Swiss-Prot record:
This is Ferrochelatase. It is found in: Cytoplasm. One of its GO terms (biological process) is heme biosynthetic process. It catalyses: heme b + 2 H(+) = protoporphyrin IX + Fe(2+). Keywords: Cytoplasm, Heme biosynthesis, Iron, Lyase, Metal-binding, Porphyrin biosynthesis.
Length: 339
């Protein structure tokens, strides 16, 4: 049998790295926002309520009210030069910079995807396989593990394999909340940005995205990993506990979420006479709606409205040299045995 004529022409011998973040709408218009929110809020990992209870609320109320409101919030922080969200911009940049870092190893192919929206995880896994990747490392861009973030990325990646006759081998990246390179990068970022201020914050809030308290009670390790990140960061900075305080943001719905809440804490501190604070978001790899609009925008406004005077938002690691050092370090570690 002539292999050149009887067998399909396929690439082989390459390793894929797929960076995956949460997702982004294609635009700020109502239609784009509704499409994005429908996919996001239909995920059973995100909303664990019974579908019989949740879907009437989702389709009857949420998708008729929130798209316009959330769209206006996105408009405030939209990357107008590229007509896209900053999360898309940063994730694409991270993939491009990582590809450059592996420039001397052409067998490594780096790509990026979103859990919700485009480009989809399934489309990029298929593209990597067509590019000759027999093995793919899926990297959920979340330092701390949560079922609503890391697990749903992994779910979607393995779901993509269900439709493939010839499946690539798949690995997933574990959480790296206590990795020394990550902690060092956060400490460097804090010191670097505080040095640019002509004032010193009385304290810094480490604001993590929240999850319902019930998820934690069911065994989700997220809360513990956030606390460990903060503890290690304090130790690296040489700060006491009250100098770097943990809070949780972005609460949605009527359930109790992890506390203390960031918004309530910011308001309380201002009312208690604290005049200068800074906020960092250690759990976000890239700046996005939750950091740029909710913290740099809403939280800053609340602090000033309630008597605070100086507020600083410390940017996420994004595609900075420190941020890329973390991502490249984690990927090289997880490729061991393959590369």
């Amino acid at each position: 049998m002539d292999a050149n004529t009887e067998h399909p022409a396929v690439g082989y011998g390459k390793l894929g790295v797929l960076l995956v973040n949460l997702g982004t709408p294609d635009g700020t218009d109502v239609t784009s926002m509704r499409r994005y929110l429908r996919e996001f809020l239909s995920d059973r990992r995100v909303i664990e309520w019974s579908r019989l209870f949740w879907y009437p609320i989702l389709y009857g109320i949420v998708l008729n009210t929130r798209p316009r409101k959330v769209g206006k919030a996105y408009e405030l922080i939209w990357n107008k030069d590229l007509n896209e969200s900053w999360l898309r911009t940063y994730t694409r940049n991270q993939a491009a910079l990582m590809a450059e870092a592996f420039g001397g190893q052409p067998q490594v192919v780096v790509d990026w995807a979103m859990r919700y929206g485009q480009p989809s995880i399934a489309s990029r896994i298929e593209a990597l396989q067509k590019a000759g990747c027999e093995r793919i490392l899926v990297f959920p861009l979340y330092p701390q593990y949560a079922a609503a973030t890391t697990a749903t990325v992994n779910d979607k990646a393995f779901e993509a394999l269900l439709k493939m006759r010839w499946q690539p081998a798949l690995r997933t990246v574990p959480p790296y909340h206590d990795d020394p390179v990550y902690i060092d990068a956060l400490a460097t970022s804090i010191n670097k940005h505080l040095a640019t201020l002509d004032w010193e914050p009385e304290l810094v809030l480490a604001s993590f995205h929240g999850i319902p308290k019930s998820y934690f009670e069911k065994g989700d390790p997220y809360y513990c990993q956030c606390q460990k990140t903060a503890r290690l960061l304090r130790e690296k900075l040489g700060w006491p506990q009250d100098r770097l305080q943990v809070t949780f943001q972005s609460r949605f719905g009527p359930e109790e979420w992890l506390q203390p809440y960031t918004d309530a804490t910011v308001e309380r501190l201002a009312k208690e006479g604290v005049k200068r604070i800074a906020v960092i978001n250690p759990g976000f790899v890239s700046d996005c709606l939750e950091t740029l609009e909710e913290i740099a925008g809403q939280a800053a406004e609340s602090f000033h409205h309630n008597g605070g005077e100086k507020f600083a938002h410390i940017p996420c690691l994004n595609d900075s040299p420190e941020g890329m050092a973390v991502l490249n370090h984690v990927v090289r570690r997880e490729l061991e045995g393959w590369l």
